[in-house]
Amino acid sequence: AFTPDADFPLIYGEKGIVRALASKMVDLSPIVAMSGGSVSNAVCDSFVVTLPKDKKLEASLKDRKDVDLSSAGEIDILTFKGKAAHGSTPEKGVNAALLAFSFLGSFYQIPFLKKLSDLLSDPTGKSFHGDSYDETFHNATWNYGVINYESNKRVFTATIDYRFGSSADPKKAIAAFEEATSTNVNILSEDKVLLADKKGPLVSTLMKSYRRTTHRIFDKPFAIGGGTYAKEAPNCVAYGSAFKGHPGDIHSPNEYIYLEDLYKQIAIY
């Protein structure tokens, strides 16, 4: 079976994905509140922290270009600016929450924030022994997309998007995260690794049709860190229908397809 849920030529491997929520009861005084991120599968690119007005803090931020400072009465509002990236490639982004943890943890000597900054800055999870590597999927990745804290409840939460290859033990990796960060982790969902035989009849037959139609005989099937509908059925792979580099505004209001591409897809399928 195949699903037209990705790019040609064919995806034979998809990382496993664990989506989880880490939480901890903790006092992060003098911080009043922290929040950032909108979805778990994207790098948090903006993180807002509110604190009591502090002239020394304000002075220390004068030369920083990655923080915007504003005030409202007796409250300072800090907006840390990172760089967005997909949750499968957190190394391509800059997590704004981790920028905040690094700065505030050192400035106010907050042990929990200093610990998170030290442990979570490496997106492979190596700092807390949550890493793994194999030739097909390369490094595991850890992304923390939505982070919140409220001083009145003293509850810190962070979403986890953990993606791993065939060599990983996800239970051990999550346990390592819990132990290192002193948090409680609640697993929300888990997708297993998908790995089809590149030389098997399914992949070989589909690649033969693709190459015969497009004449792109050197294109090869590939593996990804994301997930497709192929995981929802046995013996299934993602096979098209998009052609790499061709515009189409996927998932946008003006999503479209060139007729030339449509006719080529019909011929392949």
Where are these regions (language model features)?
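An extended, acidic, His-containing surface patch that forms the Zn2+-binding/catalytic region
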Residues: 88-151, 159, 163-167, 171-172, ...
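A structural micro-motif
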Residues: 29, 51, 67, 183, ...
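Midchain, well-structured core segments that form catalytic/ion-binding scaffolds
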Residues: 2-167
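Class I S-adenosyl-L-methionine
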Residues: 58-65, 174-182, 207, 211
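Conserved short beta-strand edge segments in small beta-sheet-based binding/regulatory domains
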Residues: 66-75, 181-191
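Generic low-polarity alpha-helical segments
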Residues: 1-2, 229
